[in-house]
A protein has these predicted regions:
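Conserved Radical SAM active-site core
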Residues: 1-88, 100-106, 111, 266-316
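Active-site beta-loop-alpha junctions enriched in small/polar residues
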Residues: 8-10, 57, 80-84, 119-123, ...
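Surface-exposed cleft-lining segments at the edges of enzyme active sites
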Residues: 84-92, 120-130, 164-171
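Conserved C-terminal portion of the radical SAM core fold
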Residues: 97-163, 181-198
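Catalytic cores of enzyme domains
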Residues: 147-250
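Peripheral terminal and linker regions in Fe-S/redox and tRNA-modifying enzymes
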Residues: 187-235, 256, 263-315
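Local cysteine-cluster metal-coordination motifs and their immediate loop/turn environment
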Residues: 245-264
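Single conserved hydrophobic/aromatic residue that forms the stacking wall/gate
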Residues: 319-331
């Protein structure tokens, strides 16, 4: 089974102790968001978990103890760093701080297991196409030696977002092509593989790939293991990722990002965060007498057992971190 720790909330930034406790105890419970009295149990043992996916905007809280997970499981990390300020992402560290944290993460796990998400790309009177071009070039120069690839998507104008962000400027196809053009050129200049995620549209002419952000071939290569060749069903429309199971909960992320789809409102998320018990098998709340607990299906995608990395392998994956070669900035 592919375990996802960060699709519904920023587990790493706010619930690291809980996550580490779950791995230590060897199981986790997750409540069905549509049927709250239905609870699924997943075993978190190496024989049941093929790989652990992380997605966060701040890995600093878990870095001191990260090896408790990475020494036992194949892993892959998505680090979201965007140019938005506190007006849009009030709970997210600054770009400079995030870049330094990503470097530390990369030093621990190897650049081959770290992807930078520049996501979502949105436009307002403040965050213009020109600002994105400058910000992306700056970040790409700093991050290139420490990442496996870059993933981006254009913001989706769902109904709640138009209410939360009335300042949002709808993107035309011309806008998207302009953005894709400079993203592709900048990524190529710094030697970064760049791809879309869950975005309809073909931008291959700009050197942008359209593969899913979590595909077995890439995850296997990053972890020196081999997965079966199976169809990737995706997690939503336009998604080409492998099916995975998330153990988080909606309405629990205090980051307060205005574009977030996982929170109904920031106030509810903050209240839930304050009620969190790191000793509970559930991220939010406790098991109730009325709950029905079922054993989750944990299908393995591995073709062969995961081999432990040798020190030689780790040195090879980290070689570009110690002596990064950087091209000259785009003038």
């Amino acid at each position: 089974m592919i375990l996802n720790t960060g699709a519904r909330t920023d587990t790493v930034q706010y619930y690291s102790e809980w996550l580490l406790n779950r791995f230590k105890e060897g199981f986790v419970l997750t409540r069905n968001p549509l049927f709250p009295d239905k609870v699924t149990r997943y075993e978190l043992t190496p024989d049941k978990i093929d790989l652990v996916l992380f997605c966060s905007k701040n890995y600093a809280p878990i870095l001191p103890r990260l090896r408790e997970i990475t020494d036992k499981y194949p892993v892959y990390f998505y680090y979201t760093i965007t140019p938005y300020g506190k007006d849009i992402e009030p709970g997210v560290p600054s770009v400079l701080e995030s870049i330094e944290t990503l470097k530390r993460l990369s030093a621990i796990v190897g650049r081959n297991r770290v992807a930078w998400r520049y996501d979502p790309v949105l436009l307002t009177s403040k965050y213009t196409i020109e600002l994105h071009a400058k910000a992306f070039a700056y970040m790409a120069e700093k991050l290139a030696p420490y990442i496996d690839r870059c993933i981006f998507s254009f913001v989706e104008l769902y109904k709640k977002l138009t209410i939360n962000m009335p300042e949002l400027i709808p993107m035309t196809e011309s806008d998207k092509r302009k953005i894709a053009d400079f993203l592709g050129k900048t990524a190529k200049h710094y030697g970064i593989r760049i791809q879309t995620c869950g975005t309809n549209g073909d931008y291959s002419e700009f050197g942008i790939h359209s593969s899913g952000c979590a595909v077995l071939s890439e995850l296997g290569k990053a972890n020196h293991c081999e997965f079966k060749d199976i169809k990737h069903k995706g997690m939503r429309e336009g998604c080409h990722c492998i099916e995975n199971r998330d153990i988080g909960a909606y309405d629990t992320c205090p980051n307060g990002c205005k574009y977030c789809y996982a929170n109904k409102n920031p106030q509810a998320a903050m209240l839930n965060y304050q009620k969190h018990n790191p000793q509970s098998p559930l991220l939010l709340g406790e098991v109730k007498d009325t709950d029905t607990i079922i054993q989750g299906v944990q299908r393995s995608y591995l073709k062969s057992k995961y081999p432990q990395l040798s020190l030689f392998d780790m040195e090879l994956s980290l070689i570009h971190i110690s002596e990064p070669t950087r091209p000259e900035p785009i003038s």
